[in-house]
Design a protein with these regions (language model features):
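Active-site segments of SGNH/GDSL-like serine hydrolases
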Residues: 94-98, 114-150, 173-174
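Serine-esterase "nucleophile elbow" of acetyl-processing enzymes
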Residues: 1-65, 80-87
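Alpha-helical structural signal in soluble globular domains
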Residues: 42-50, 82, 115, 119, ...
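Structural recognition of the beta-strand scaffold that forms the well-ordered cores
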Residues: 15-17, 23, 61-66, 90-94, ...
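Short, solvent-exposed loop/turn segments at secondary-structure boundaries
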Residues: 28-33, 103-107, 139-143
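Solvent-exposed loop/turn segments at secondary-structure junctions
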Residues: 21-24, 67-72, 97-101, 133-137, ...
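Catalytic His-Asp segment of secreted/periplasmic serine-dependent ester chemistry enzymes
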Residues: 134-215
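Internal alpha/beta domain cores that form substrate/cofactor-binding pockets in large enzymes
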Residues: 16, 46, 56-86, 98-127
């Protein structure tokens, strides 16, 4: 049986950003949007600014449910308490970076992510699948990322859910390495990198969704 989430006008939209340290970010350093050092905080700012330009009454909140060092198995275990209890409309799922660091099989990682997508659908939450960003300094860990990302896109297509290519958004197109301009330490992103992810998610998914409610 196909589960098709129903999209309808709403006065408030809640999004949970679910993942590991790439979701946690560095910290929220202040009220200045230029200082946002996590993609969820910057994404919320972009959404509210966009709606303000349309004079829309819709309110958007992006709840950060990242856990540093988490694996996809851990994300699966805590999905109910960290995501379902929030009763969000959408959940952005970004996981697998740490699994690859522990040399886990990309197919196993994809299985865990698939179960998270299904758990969201079963709870009436729309999942947004994200590919894993690249790395700088350990080229041998780029191919498993590419394999995992192909599986992520395939699993998203099977479920007719959106997928966002954060690898392409932050990688050097010539080397497939994490772009130096977005890298903090080769694995984690700097402030510019987290803002890039927030902007990419907004431009490639959230903007069009908000426009439906701002009319």
């Amino acid at each position: 049986m196909t589960r098709s989430p129903i999209t309808k006008p709403i006065a408030a939209m809640k999004i949970v950003a679910f993942g590991d340290s790439l979701t946690v970010g560095e910290s929220e350093l202040g009220s200045d949007p230029e200082e946002y050092a996590s993609y969820p905080g910057y994404l919320e700012f972009l959404a509210q600014r966009h709606l303000g330009k349309h004079r829309s009454d819709v309110k958007v909140s992006v709840v950060n449910r990242g856990v540093c060092g988490d694996l996809t198995s851990g994300m699966l275990r805590r999905f109910s308490r960290d995501v379902v209890v929030e009763k969000p409309d959408y959940v952005i799922i970004l996981g697998g970076t740490n699994d690859i660091g522990w040399l886990m099989d990309p197919a196993m990682i994809a299985d865990n992510l698939s179960m998270i997508y299904d758990a969201a659908l079963d709870a009436g939450i729309v999942p947004i699948a994200c590919t894993v960003p690249s790395i700088l300094g350990l080229d041998e860990l780029i191919p498993p990322r590419s394999r995992l990302n192909r599986m992520i896109r395939t699993e998203a297509e099977k479920r007719s859910i959106a997928s966002l290519d954060l690898f392409a958004a932050t990688a050097d197109s010539e080397t497939n390495r994490l772009s130096e301009q977005y890298s903090a330490d080769g694995l984690h992103l700097n402030m510019k990198g987290y803002r890039q992810i927030g902007q990419y998610i907004f431009d490639n998914w959230l903007r069009a969704l908000l426009d439906k409610y701002a009319q």
